Amino acid sequence: LDAAWYKSNATRQLLDLPMDPFSGYASRKINAGNIQNEGLEISLNGTILDNPAGLSWSSTAQFSLNRNKIKELYEGVNLYDIKTFDAIQIVAPVGGYYGEIYGQTFMRVTDENSPHYGKIVVGDDGLPLISTEKSKVGNQSPDWMMGWTNNFSYKGFNLSFLIDFRIGGSIYSATASNLYTRGNAAGTVVNGDRAEFVVPNTVVQQGSGYAENTVAVTPQNYWERIGSTGNYGLPEVYTYSATNVRLRNITFGYEFNRQMLKKTPFQRVRLSATCNNVWMIHYNLPGIDPESVAATNTNATGFENGAAPTSRSYTFNVTVGF
């Protein structure tokens, strides 16, 4: 068992600050900021089974978590824009954490004394109203990650596999927004029908108060309203948990014993087959791999838009020794 806890501050980061376009430049580079990194790493490995019959099983688990807190940026700057995708921003706010996802949300009852506190406000047409202010809808960083490797051996045969756990964090899916807005997502059909419905947990404003909403809407009108915020739809709805558990790779091999190779010129022969990106055991983003992010030239990994799916690969190996 190995465990390590760390805490460090990275200062004078290279930042791009926006400038007045009339200056002739879009931004300027400065050295500023103070980001505090705090985390924990644990590694546990051992032999679980090693019997005289030749069967052995060894296992290794590696756990990690990390928090990047923004202590300060630059005088007069309280929020650094890592990347903006239309109405969605991935930012680093002072007092918050690196990679927070900001965007618009449903308009809700904010009076804590109201019996309808927290409910979505709709218009007279029964469709939800959208807030004009941006607020936090998630963070791209996982709460914790773990890799679990297992290795089994028996009389020349070997089987090993790695399971990856990425728990927590969020990702905005513009792909899901496009599918729902156009009625191509399974969620736009309930029990094989697109019947009118009353948006659940909603109220309509009446004078200085609110009343339960009873106005039914069509699925088409509802999803078009949700998709009308910018080009990518309402961030609150299309920000999903990025939690996923996957069988990352598996390898099966066989090594011939030397007795079998006595009449050959080989000292060693091993055959093996490997498959990578084998099986998505659990995920929350419908039909999309959370690792399929929209951009590769930025640290903003909490956004995807029609990205190509991650590939599955197969490898066959023959290893010989003379």
Predicted regions and their residues:
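Short, highly charged low-complexity linear segments
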Residues: 103-106, 125-127, 224-229, 307-317
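Short, flexible active-site loops
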Residues: 132-133, 144, 157, 230-238
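Conserved small-residue
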Residues: 30, 40, 49-140, 171, ...
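Conserved SET/PR-domain catalytic core that frames the SAM/AdoMet-binding pocket
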Residues: 60, 132, 142-156, 248-253, ...
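Short hydrophobic/aromatic-rich motifs at helix boundaries and adjacent loops
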Residues: 12-16, 118-120, 220-228
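Glycine-rich, aromatic-lined ligand/substrate-binding cores of catalytic
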Residues: 137-174
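Extracellular/periplasmic, surface-exposed regions of secreted and cell-surface proteins
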Residues: 1-94, 230, 234-322
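Extracytoplasmic gating/loop element in the C-terminal half of outer-membrane beta-barrel translocons
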Residues: 168-270, 275
